[in-house]
Design a protein with these regions (language model features):
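Extreme N-terminal basic, low-complexity initiation segments
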Residues: 2-8
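Accessory terminal helices/loops
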Residues: 9, 13, 17-31, 122, ...
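Metallo-beta-lactamase
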Residues: 53, 60-66, 134, 143-146, ...
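Conserved S/T- and glycine-rich ATP-binding loop of Class I adenylate-forming
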Residues: 47, 96, 169
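Active-site HxH/HxHxD metal-binding segment of metal-dependent hydrolases
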Residues: 55, 62-162, 252
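Conserved beta-strand hairpin/beta-sheet module of binuclear metal-dependent hydrolase folds
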Residues: 27-89, 178-187
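Generic preference for hydrophobic
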Residues: 32, 93, 117, 166, ...
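Short, basic and Ser/Thr-rich N-terminal targeting/leader segments
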Residues: 28, 40-43, 144, 160, ...
């Protein structure tokens, strides 16, 4: 599971694309398609290699009717239709972290299109914390083995001929990763649009100072790097947006633009977090997402349940 080889179908990719994937000096521009889930303000992505049929899916959403206890896959089906319609081969299903505000559709996407489910290798830390909170027994593995691949900081992998790099950017959670794919960085919940600022840092294992340093790591990328958000809430009623750039964020981000001191950010972020309630779907989301998007195992009658721990968060 913890192997690090880059899996590439060499027969399917032209030599020039392989050379580009191996050479960090070559600027690559993937095609990026966004899918907005209005119920959770989440943006999922299909990332395509223009030089082959390969693609990846990032942060797919499973629909949950919380009051009725019903799941469905309308949003995931839109992604499936896109991939099939463009005759793409899915190589990766990437989770930027264990999300606390929506349930992952990664297993559904994998069963429908193939691909490998991947997350950062600090997932074991998150599983240990929430395994205790949800009183999971020994059958719940706390080693990340529910996922097909665990990325360490700096791991390089390929999407067809695209070079992708996994960057550990903790602070929102201990396991958050940013994925730099060509000239595009998928930042998860670490960074928001300039008028949205930054993610909260008060979940178990979160830390505002660590978050600041992770954001500055992202903002040390080349100024033209495209940044793709996992969430947007349309501050002030503006239309939903999900793409900015390093240059825009360094100039305009209300929390972490150039000139903001680390200590000032920490003071602001911690004070703001004390005013925030928990996300509406945090309890079901964590139980599912720490299992790589699988529901908890069924009981003797084949029924599946989600727990509601009292005063645990």
């Amino acid at each position: 599971l913890r192997d690090r080889p880059v899996l590439i179908d060499a027969a399917a990719i032209e030599e020039r694309h392989m050379s580009a994937a191996a050479d960090p000096s070559v600027t690559q521009r993937p095609d990026v398609f966004a899918f907005f889930d209005a119920a959770t303000n989440t943006i999922s992505y299909v990332v395509e290699d223009p030089g082959s049929d390969a693609c990846a899916v990032i942060d797919p959403v499973m629909d949950l009717d919380y009051a009725a206890g019903r799941i469905s896959f309308a949003g995931a089906d839109a992604i499936v239709a896109h991939v099939r319609g463009r005759r793409r081969t899915l190589q990766w299903i990437v989770e930027t972290h264990v999300h606390a505000d929506h349930l992952s559709a990664a297993p559904y996407i994998k069963a429908t299109l193939g691909g490998r489910i991947a997350i950062g290798d600090r997932i074991a830390v998150v599983q240990e914390v929430f395994g205790r909170i949800f009183a999971e027994g020994p059958s719940f593995r706390r080693d990340g083995s529910q996922f097909d691949r665990l990325f360490a900081d700096g791991d390089i992998y390929a999407i067809g001929g695209l070079r992708a790099v996994a960057l550990h950017t903790p602070g929102h959670t201990p396991a958050c990763m940013t994925h730099l794919i060509g000239d595009a960085a998928f930042v998860g919940d670490t960074l928001f649009m300039p008028d949205g600022g930054s993610a909260r840092a008060d979940f178990p294992g979160g830390d505002a100072r660590t978050l600041f340093r992770s954001m500055r790591r992202i903002l040390d990328l080349p100024p033209s790097t495209r940044l793709f958000m996992c969430h947007d809430y349309g501050p002030g009623g503006r239309p939903i947006r999900w793409e900015s750039s390093v240059a825009e964020e360094r100039r305009d981000n209300i929390h972490v633009r150039d000139g903001v001191a680390e200590n000032d950010f920490v003071t602001m972020r911690e004070a703001r977090d004390r005013t925030l309630g928990m996300p509406r779907l945090i309890l079901p989301s964590l139980q599912v997402n720490m299992r790589a998007g699988e529901l908890p195992p069924p009981d003797a009658d084949g029924r599946r349940f989600l727990k509601l721990p009292i005063d645990a968060l």
